[in-house]
């Protein structure tokens, strides 16, 4: 339920940031994601840097406003008569600037009021943000690789980077340390022409699966954006399941409609 996410956000157990896309992330991972944000090539962060370069004086003034006046919502700023918003959603300038500061880490989402984001200084929302530990990019990569494989259950190397949208593609040399220490295990999957990767925490489950001792207990309806199926190539290989979100498909190629 949305209310659960909002409660966890306001309780500072989660925070919002650009990861795979706009995500809720456990607060204990704040330093990891902030450390990686400086090299992340995600469009949300790249766009925020461009907005800052184009509107730096206005953005600095807005940041000072938040610093002295406190948390704000975009609705606190009135659109001037006849003014049209910019960008894809027709946002007013202040909304674009708030979102840019959020993507760049200066602002965080303190809570949501009726789905509207409430922005405040990062150090007021989460005090450790002022002096978080800067992790080397290589260390963050190793952590993200291990967590991605664990989340995916079983994975081919080419699927790993999409989980946290890390770049570039995972190299074999990055897998060796995790394989050597036993965090990841190479396994064979019938019908695959390359080794698969399994997190060691899933080894007991994999052994049960190999003995055909796992039984489905229930069915559920998934969003097309669910991590289980958002990688279409993985869904095809894993489940022989192919789909296309038709709102993103040219009209002439749609089967079912928008």
Question: Predicted segment positions?
Answer:
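Long, charged, low-complexity, helical-prone intrinsically disordered regions
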Residues: 1-258
